[in-house]
């Protein structure tokens, strides 16, 4: 057991170039890692903001309703952040469907403004379950917001389009 612990300690020392101050090297590594994570989060937030601005500039209007759709190579958390930022920018008459293709897995994220839920009887959870079938998936959520995953990456664009179709604008 003592030899196993010593071997493990030697392996860790080797990872840190056999430094004499192993504790200090590990603390420095952890601090640098935390700093890099914060920088990545900041970069991702900036990317979401730029993407939001591009999508808003390209939003369609159908019968007075702003329709924002796209397929992007983003993570689920970024997709969620993005649609909520779009909803903040367009608080009324909004239908938004974002397809995500990160890690070669389709993810569909849908958000509606409250007036579309209340006055037009739209339910993102119900609509996304139907649209997700096109990507061999399933999901659900609340009346104003829902996410669905799937297996068929080729179906993500059709699923995004299906959301708009099912909204009956």
Language model features with spans:
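Terminal appendage regions of diverse proteins
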Residues: 1-169
């Amino acid at each position: 057991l003592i030899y196993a612990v010593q071997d493990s300690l030697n392996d860790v020392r080797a990872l840190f170039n056999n430094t004499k101050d192993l504790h200090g090297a590990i603390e420095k590594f952890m601090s640098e890692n935390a700093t890099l994570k914060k920088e990545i989060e900041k970069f991702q937030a900036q990317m979401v903001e730029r993407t939001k601005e591009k999508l808003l500039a390209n939003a369609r209007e159908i019968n007075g309703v702003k329709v924002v759709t796209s397929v992007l190579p983003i993570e689920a958390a970024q997709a969620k952040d993005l649609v909520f930022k779009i909803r903040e920018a367009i608080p009324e008459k909004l239908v938004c469907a974002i397809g995500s293709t990160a890690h070669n897995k389709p993810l569909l994220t849908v958000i509606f403004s409250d007036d579309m839920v209340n006055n037009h009887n739209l339910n993102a959870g119900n609509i996304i379950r139907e649209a997700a079938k096109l990507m061999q998936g399933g999901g659900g959520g609340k009346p104003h917001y829902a996410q669905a995953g799937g297996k068929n990456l080729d179906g993500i664009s059709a699923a995004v389009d299906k959301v708009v179709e099912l909204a009956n604008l």
